[in-house]
Every structure is written in structure tokens, then in C-alpha cells.
């Protein structure tokens, strides 16, 4: 009996449409490489039905499977563009620490809670 998830079945169209679009792009990359569903599924170590679900944009497929598929298709770098950090966070990462702040990753004696 297939698993069901109330939260996955109630996805808003604003969420479902990008997943479907992503699935179609994955399929296009697979077809461009002239791989059959069976060949790609074997490379992904999943069933052909699971690959079809991924290519259909089904929300229940694993994000790990998606990452593996992107890697196989030479598209793993595109995953870096998903949910980029807000500009404020990126700017804070570029700020250098002063000597008074201490080295990154070092907890001052007074800040330790153990």
C-alpha cells in the first residue's frame, strides 16, 4: 500500500508547478544523453517508477535522489542557486573580525556554558 502524506497532497500550485518544471528539465537532460528510464534509474540506484516520479515533479521523492540525479546529469552546481542566503547574511560573512573579537570558532571564557 503506498504511503500518503496529507501535507504533500495539499501542496499549493505555487509549489507544485516549479517541481513539475524541474522534473521536465531533468527528463530533458536524460533524453539529451540518450538514456532510457531504466538506464538512468539503474545509475540512480532507484526503481524506474521512482525516477518517473522525480521527472513528474512528485513532491514525495527524496532530495538526495534529486541531488544524485543532478550530479549524474552534470548539473549539481545548479543546486547552489536554490534558496540563496539573504544579502544581509552574505554581507556579514565578508566582514573581517577584529583582533578584539577573537578568532572565528573560538568561544571566549565567559561565554562557555559548561
Please state what every model-predicted region is.
Residues 34-52:
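Short alpha-helical DNA-recognition segment
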Residues 57-71:
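Short, basic-rich loop-to-helix N-cap that marks the start of a DNA-contacting helix
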Residues 24-39, 100-104:
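Short basic helix-loop element that most often maps to the first helix and adjoining turn
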Residues 1-18, 79-82, 86-114:
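N-terminal flexible/basic segments that precede or flank functional cores
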Amino acid at each position: 500500500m503506498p504511503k500518503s502524506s496529507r501535507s504533500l497532497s495539499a501542496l499549493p500550485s505555487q509549489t507544485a508547478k516549479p517541481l513539475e518544471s524541474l522534473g521536465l528539465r531533468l527528463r530533458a537532460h536524460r533524453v539529451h544523453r540518450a538514456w532510457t528510464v531504466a538506464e538512468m534509474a539503474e545509475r540512480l540506484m532507484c526503481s524506474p517508477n521512482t525516477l518517473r516520479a522525480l521527472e513528474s515533479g512528485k513532491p514525495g521523492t527524496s532530495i538526495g535522489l534529486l541531488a544524485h540525479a543532478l550530479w549524474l546529469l552534470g548539473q549539481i552546481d545548479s543546486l547552489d542557486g536554490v534558496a540563496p542566503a539573504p544579502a544581509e547574511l552574505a554581507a556579514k560573512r565578508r566582514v573581517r573580525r577584529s583582533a578584539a573579537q577573537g578568532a572565528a570558532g573560538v568561544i571566549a571564557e565567559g561565554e562557555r556554558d559548561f
